[in-house]
Regions:
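Glycine-rich short-loop/terminal segments
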Residues: 1-73
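A short linear-motif detector with a strong N-terminal bias
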Residues: 13-15, 74-76, 105-110
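Exposed beta-strand and adjacent loop surfaces of beta-rich binding modules
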Residues: 32, 93, 126
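Residues in well-ordered beta-strands of folded domains
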Residues: 36, 97, 130
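Short HxH-centered metal-ligating active-site micro-motif
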Residues: 59-102
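Active-site or metal-binding loop neighborhoods of secreted/extracellular toxin and effector enzymes
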Residues: 100-149
Length: 149
């Protein structure tokens, strides 16, 4: 399915995908990255990858606490922030709908959220990310937590 910008998303990303900015395209002047978050089916609101907000700080702290040193580099990313919201809110499942795909999920990408999320999310909890990839195709992936805390 496509939103008003013509960006394609998985069907379960709607109606939120209709309200996202145009998809982020690497190497170009871009629209801002934005994500809508749900925890256990309850809408939480939208977040951006701002570096200085409280969720980025908490994600950096969690990376440190879990000794995921490389994950600190992406602590401002919306997926990492959503994972912190999930953990601190004692939820079991987060859904993130964003106008991109997680870093690290595309062929030839360096390590990123796609690699770190399973070790960042606690055992028994999960996150589904719905977005649109670099080629404009729908993206859907569920990350099952492996962290012991």
């Amino acid at each position: 399915m496509a939103n008003p910008h013509g960006d394609r998303y998985p069907p379960e990303a709607f109606p939120d995908a209709d309200d996202l900015p145009p998809r982020v395209r690497r190497g170009r002047g871009n629209a801002r990255l934005e994500a809508f978050i749900q925890i256990d089916g309850k809408p939480i609101g939208s977040i951006t990858p701002a570096r200085g907000d409280v969720w980025a700080q908490r994600a950096a702290r969690r990376s440190f606490d879990l000794e995921l040193w490389q994950a600190d580099d992406v602590s401002n990313h919306v997926e990492m922030k959503a994972a912190v919201i999930l953990v601190e809110g004692r939820g079991t499942h987060a859904q993130v709908i964003l106008n991109h795909a997680p870093c690290g999920s595309e062929k030839y990408d360096p390590a990123g959220c796609d690699d770190y999320l399973p070790d960042f999310i606690p055992i028994g909890r999960s996150m589904t990310v719905l977005g649109t990839d670099a080629r404009g195709n729908p993206f859907r992936r569920t990350y099952e937590g492996k962290a012991v805390r």
